[in-house]
């Protein structure tokens, strides 16, 4: 009788335990299958390409981007595969030689034809955006600017790509697209979250970076002010990206790119000379001759227009950083401000907050001066470096930097001093907030600038709402796979143990 009760108890317990174990094993198997299927989808073979030409004031560059077709709405999936710099000046310089535009574009367009697979030529969009150089030409001669763009368009349409047009983008667009680019590359638009990282790591906040862009003819500042009233609607843009709203301040200062700023300074200094300028922003021993008419033909220098008795200007460098900075400061008119805060020329500027990425000429000039590393995060180091560099004789520089073009080498003293003065006197950074400026050329092998943001916007690859599901991080995925595998193994071991446990085990359970 007792043996029968023991047998019935064993059978009852075994069935219940096995049911529980079976249910647990099914859940573990389903979890493993679900993780495997969602996380290890085969990589899409269909890669898409996009081409953007940046027609700047001093040169034109072509960028080729690629991305997996099935991940267009993910963040950080677009990568740069090629950068090709066209030989020659910016397209605005072709006003009197339109017939040379075909040759100008040929090398880089042929390079694009080689890089992009032939089977995808017809579906690869090509965009050309012209910036401040063409904005200035349009101010001077709108018909001529239109002719250049139409000639460029005719040339590009001869290639087997999906040409989407050539246009002059506004300064506001240039600033906004640069801001989108840097924050897309730094992965700042999507809040990182998962089962085991619900709280961001210390220092891993999701605040966006501000963008500082400097070209030859204009400069842009763009950022999201925190807890500040945006007093100037024309400088405010509203974006909804990945389910989050952004109120972005942006302004483009036409004529305040480094090349046009130099022309402004030289034209201003001409008033009190007899045709010779002793220029502290050029190195001692350096000489340059310029046609006076060239100085006054640009819209940026018209405010200094005056009648001069000499046709040619002679520049003689003196190499003095302090005097150079003193002569640059008057370019920024801070005497008038109709708002609570201004940058210069009466333009509203909120208090710069948070980290900023400084790219384009900001990066190239500071890179030449070896100020893009941690040392460059101290304003005092930047000042002392420029002071030492500007004082070096021209002959010495030519000997040490013989491979650098004379135009660029001769202007690094001015350009570096101008950048320092623009950031301090124009944008009102301080010695304390200078450390928040990060000079960047590339992020993850992709050039920082407005072109990527431009393409992302035109191809609608940044959704307004956050994707409903994203892949787990690699560490989370591995952890879950190991966890559910262990659960499955433990369930099997317990099941085997239950089925083969000696009879006294069941007696102990009574």
Curated annotation (Swiss-Prot):
Topology feature Extracellular, residues: 38-477
Positions annotated as active site in the UniProt record: 174 (proton acceptor)
UniProt keyword list: ATP-binding, Calcium, Disulfide bond, Glycoprotein, Hydrolase, Magnesium, Membrane, Nucleotide-binding, Transmembrane, Transmembrane helix
Which PROSITE patterns does its entry note? GDA1_CD39_NTPASE
Transmembrane domains' residue ranges = 17-37, 478-498
Biological processes, Gene Ontology terms: nucleoside diphosphate catabolic process; platelet aggregation
What topology does it adopt in the membrane? Multi-pass membrane protein
Obligatory cofactor(s):
Ca(2+); Mg(2+)
Q: Which cysteines are joined by disulfide bonds?
A: 84-108, 255-300, 281-324, 337-342, 390-413
Q: Where in the cell is it found?
A: Membrane; Membrane, Caveola
Q: Which residues are glycosylated?
A: 73, 245, 274, 291, 333, 370, 457
Supply one GO molecular-function term: ITPase activity
Q: Does the keyword RNA-binding apply?
A: no
Maturation and modification? N-glycosylated.
Q: Which reaction does it catalyse?
A: a ribonucleoside 5'-triphosphate + 2 H2O = a ribonucleoside 5'-phosphate + 2 phosphate + 2 H(+); a ribonucleoside 5'-triphosphate + H2O = a ribonucleoside 5'-diphosphate + phosphate + H(+); a ribonucleoside 5'-diphosphate + H2O = a ribonucleoside 5'-phosphate + phosphate + H(+); ATP + 2 H2O = AMP + 2 phosphate + 2 H(+)
Activity regulation reads:
The ATP diphosphohydrolase activity is decreased by half by sodium azide.
- InterPro entries, per the entry: GDA1_CD39_NTPase, Lactate_DH/Glyco_Ohase_4_C
Which tissues carry this protein? Highest expression found in vascular endothelium, smooth muscle, spleen and lung (at protein level). High expression also found in stomach, duodenum, kidney, lymph node and aorta (at protein level).
Example GO CC term: the record gives:
caveola
Give its E.C. classification number: 3.6.1.5
Residue ranges, Cytoplasmic compartment? 1-16, 499-510
Assembly behavior: Homodimer; disulfide-linked.
Q: Which family does it belong to?
A: Belongs to the GDA1/CD39 NTPase family.
Task: Please describe what this protein does.
Answer: Catalyzes the hydrolysis of both di- and triphosphate nucleotides (NDPs and NTPs) and hydrolyze NTPs to nucleotide monophosphates (NMPs) in two distinct successive phosphate-releasing steps, with NDPs as intermediates and participates in the regulation of extracellular levels of nucleotides. By hydrolyzing proinflammatory ATP and platelet-activating ADP to AMP, it blocks platelet aggregation and supports blood flow.
Matching entries from PANTHER family are given as: ADENOSINE/GUANOSINE DIPHOSPHATASE, ECTONUCLEOSIDE TRIPHOSPHATE DIPHOSPHOHYDROLASE 1
- Protein name as catalogued: Ectonucleoside triphosphate diphosphohydrolase 1
* Organism annotation: Sus scrofa
């Amino acid at each position: 009788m007792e043996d029968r009760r023991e047998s019935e108890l064993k059978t009852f317990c075994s069935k219940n335990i096995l049911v529980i174990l079976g249910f647990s094993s099914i859940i573990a198997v389903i979890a493993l299958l679900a993780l495997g299927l969602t996380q290890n989808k085969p990589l899409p073979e269909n890669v898409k390409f996009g081409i953007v030409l940046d027609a700047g004031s001093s040169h034109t560059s072509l960028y080729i981007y690629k991305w997996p077709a099935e991940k267009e709405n993910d963040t950080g999936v677009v990568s740069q595969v090629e950068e090709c710099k066209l030989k020659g000046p910016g397209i605005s310089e072709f006003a009197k030689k339109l017939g040379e535009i075909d040759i100008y574009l040929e090398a880089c367009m042929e390079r694009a034809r080689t890089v992009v697979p032939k089977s995808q030529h017809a579906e690869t969009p090509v965009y050309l955006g012209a910036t401040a150089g063409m904005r200035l030409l349009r101010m001077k001669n709108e018909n001529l600017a239109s002719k250049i763009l139409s000639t460029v368009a005719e040339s590009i349409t001869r290639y087997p790509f999906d040409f989407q047009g050539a246009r002059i983008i506004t300064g506001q667009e240039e600033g906004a697209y640069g801001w989108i680019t840097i924050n897309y590359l730094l992965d700042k638009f999507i809040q990182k979250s998962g089962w085991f990282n619900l709280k961001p790591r210390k220092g891993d906040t999701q605040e966006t970076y501000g963008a500082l862009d400097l070209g030859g003819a204009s400069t842009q500042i763009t950022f999201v002010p925190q807890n500040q009233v945006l007093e100037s609607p024309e400088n405010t843009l509203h974006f909804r990206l990945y389910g989050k709203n952004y109120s972005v301040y942006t302004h483009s200062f036409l004529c305040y790119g480094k090349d046009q700023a130099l022309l402004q300074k030289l034209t201003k200094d001409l008033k009190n000379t007899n045709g010779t300028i002793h220029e502290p922003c050029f190195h001692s021993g350096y000489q340059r001759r310029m046609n006076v008419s060239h100085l006054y033909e640009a819209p940026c220098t018209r405010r200094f227009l005056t009648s001069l008795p000499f046709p040619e200007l002679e520049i003689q460098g003196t190499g003095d950083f302090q005097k150079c900075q003193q002569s640059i400061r008057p370019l920024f008119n801070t005497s008038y401000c109709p708002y609570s805060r201004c940058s210069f020329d009466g333009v509203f500027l909120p208090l710069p907050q948070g980290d900023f990425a400084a790219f384009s000429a900001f990066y190239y000039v500071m890179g030449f001066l070896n100020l893009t590393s941690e040392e460059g995060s101290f304003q005092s180091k930047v000042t002392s470096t420029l002071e030492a560099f500007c004082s070096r004789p021209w002959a010495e520089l030519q000997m040490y930097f013989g491979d650098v073009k004379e135009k660029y080498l001769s202007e690094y003293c001015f350009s570096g001093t101008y950048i320092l003065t623009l950031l301090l006197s124009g944008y009102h950074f301080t010695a304390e907030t200078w450390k928040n400026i990060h000079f960047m050329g590339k992020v993850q092998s992709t050039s920082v600038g407005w072109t990527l943001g431009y393409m992302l916007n035109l191809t609608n690859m940044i959704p307004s709402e956050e994707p409903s599901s994203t892949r787990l991080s690699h560490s989370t995925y591995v952890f879950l796979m190991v966890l559910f595998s262990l659960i499955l193994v433990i369930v099997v071991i317990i099941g085997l143990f239950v089925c083969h446990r000696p009879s006294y085990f069941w007696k102990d359970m009574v």
